[in-house]
A protein has these predicted regions:
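Pre-Walker A (Motif I) flank of P-loop NTPase domains
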Residues: 1-5, 63-65
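Structural recognition of the conserved hydrophobic beta-strand(s) that form the central parallel beta-sheet
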Residues: 7, 67-71
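P-loop (Walker A) phosphate-binding loop of NTP-binding proteins
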Residues: 10
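Conserved glycine(s) of the Walker
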Residues: 14
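Conserved substrate/cofactor phosphate-moiety recognition/catalytic segment
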Residues: 17-67
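Short, glycine/charged-enriched secondary-structure capping and boundary segments
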Residues: 21-23, 47-48, 82-85, 108-111, ...
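NTP-dependent small-molecule kinase module
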Residues: 140-188
Length: 188
């Protein structure tokens, strides 16, 4: 079955590293769309890389190919692409990578820059971190399955949502997933 796979999380949570884990496990990811990699390979700024990423996703959907997108979920274009994919019979799977604090994300980005990687302004990270649950609220209802991983000290699966039902997958419950789940229960 064709899938639209999202590897999502705030900047610095380890999305690209997690993609490597999935590849190592032999998970079929299809065409991978990574705006950061597009920017680096083509010497594009963030806006141009984002536009190229949208074109690549649209081409995959048009051709019925499985596609994997790395995303912070901060763009409304992600939601539009998911809706289009659902209309075309795609199964939507999201892997969400979380951390407890924005400072951990900022620290990891600074470490990445020291190693020659790309930078993200701290204000952008703070804004995305602050609004991460709102972003999830826009996307989760469109997904067939959501798997939540904590990356405080390596990737640990902490929860999943299948067919709209949330469940913890083990006893490890980092603050961010407890807060997200509590907010969802309070809204119901």
């Amino acid at each position: 079955m064709k899938e639209y796979i999202l590897i999502a999380g705030v900047n610095g949570t380890g999305k690209s590293s997690f993609r490597g884990v999935l590849e190592g496990q032999g998970v079929p990811l299809g065409h991978i769309v990574d705006p950061d990699l597009i920017a680096k390979q083509n010497n594009f700024n963030e806006l141009a890389a984002g536009k190229q990423a949208v074109r690549e996703i649209q081409n995959c959907l048009k051709n019925g190919e499985t596609v994997t997108q790395e995303t912070t979920l901060s763009s409304h274009q992600v939601r539009k692409s998911i809706i289009k994919a659902k209309e075309q019979g795609y199964r939507i799977v999201m892997y969400y990578i979380g951390l407890n604090t924005k400072y951990e994300s900022i620290y990891r980005i600074a470490n990445r820059v020291r190693k020659g990687g790309h930078d993200i302004p701290p204000d952008d990270v703070i804004r995305r971190f602050t609004h991460r649950f709102e972003a999830l609220d826009r996307i989760v209802p469109l997904c067939d399955k959501v798997i939540f991983y904590d990356n405080d000290n390596g990737f640990v699966k902490v929860a999943e949502i299948t067919d709209g039902t949330f469940r913890y997958t083990n006893g490890y419950r980092p603050d961010w997933i407890v807060e997200y789940h509590h907010n969802k229960q309070t809204e119901q």
